[in-house]
């Protein structure tokens, strides 16, 4: 049962400076209207990494870099191997909270390989994230 799995990971979410005040006020929101979005290769979700160099790519060109260190409820993740390609694993349209729950999963874990250097951790419900620390690097 996915509801009983309390598996969490302490992960990194990189964001652009203009987004930080909205995040502090409202938390991370999937597809906010007022934010700069950096892509959705694995569907519309909240993306994290265990690697700062991966998250650094989402901080933009400002000299200051902002990382959120978050407790992320991964529960029982579905596993996807490498870069997204049509016909491989679940489809992008299935990469959402309701579909993953229907097949017994809470999140998506993308394993490195097939050209992907770093793993990615994606949740599709904003209540699965909780900011523990904010790292602001100058």
Regions found by a protein language model. Name each.
Residues 43-46, 104:
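Glycine-centered small-residue hotspots that permit tight backbone geometry or close packing
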Residues 10-13, 45-48, 56, 68:
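Conserved, well-structured core segments
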Residues 31-35, 52-57:
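Eukaryotic intrinsically disordered and solvent-exposed regulatory patches
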Residues 16-19, 47, 52-55, 73-77:
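Conserved beta-strand elements of beta-rich interaction domains across eukaryotes
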Residues 1-42, 65:
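ADP-ribose/NAD+-binding catalytic cleft of ART/PARP-like enzymes
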Residues 16, 25, 34, 62-138:
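Active-site and NAD+-binding cores of ADP-ribose-processing enzymes
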Residues 23, 58-59:
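A short acidic (Asp/Glu
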């Amino acid at each position: 049962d996915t509801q009983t799995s309390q598996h969490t990971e302490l992960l990194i979410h990189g964001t652009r400076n203009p987004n930080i005040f909205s995040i502090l006020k409202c938390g991370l929101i999937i597809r906010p209207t007022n934010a700069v979005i950096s892509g959705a290769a694995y569907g519309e979700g909240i993306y994290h990494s265990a690697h700062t160099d991966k998250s650094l790519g989402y901080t933009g060109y400002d000299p200051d870099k902002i990382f959120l260190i978050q407790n992320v409820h991964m529960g029982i993740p579905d596993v996807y191997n490498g870069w997204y390609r049509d016909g491989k694993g679940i489809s992008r349209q299935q990469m959402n909270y309701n579909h993953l729950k229907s097949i017994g999963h809470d999140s998506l874990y993308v394993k490195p390989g097939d050209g992907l250097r770093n793993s990615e951790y994606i949740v599709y419900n904003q209540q699965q994230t909780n900011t523990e620390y904010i790292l602001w690097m100058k």
